[in-house]
Amino acid sequence: MAEAASKWLDNRLRESLPEEVKVIKPAAGYSSCPDHTLKRDIMMLLSGEYDLGIKLTESFAMIPEASICGLIFMHPEACYPEIRRISREQYEDYAARRGMDEETARRFLGHLLR
């Protein structure tokens, strides 16, 4: 269902945008957007207007399990980044910007360290 909804949205956006505009939809927790904690922020932004019936576990797994959340970008030069490894400096900078303590950063970003 989530995949079908994503495809439907993709088709609607492509129909309404000029051909040269690319649409990308990086999903939190996947390689182009590996920080699972972003799900909390996305859900908080939506919770004021919508009761989606989606819950997050302590480890940011979504319930129901078929749920997915992400961001949508539309631009002629939009492309998916592939984030496999980051330096210690990038790790510390990102954690500081997100307001993560060391334990949270290690838990959700540690696998990305070179």
Predicted regions and their residues:
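C-terminal anchoring/interaction modules
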Residues: L112-R114
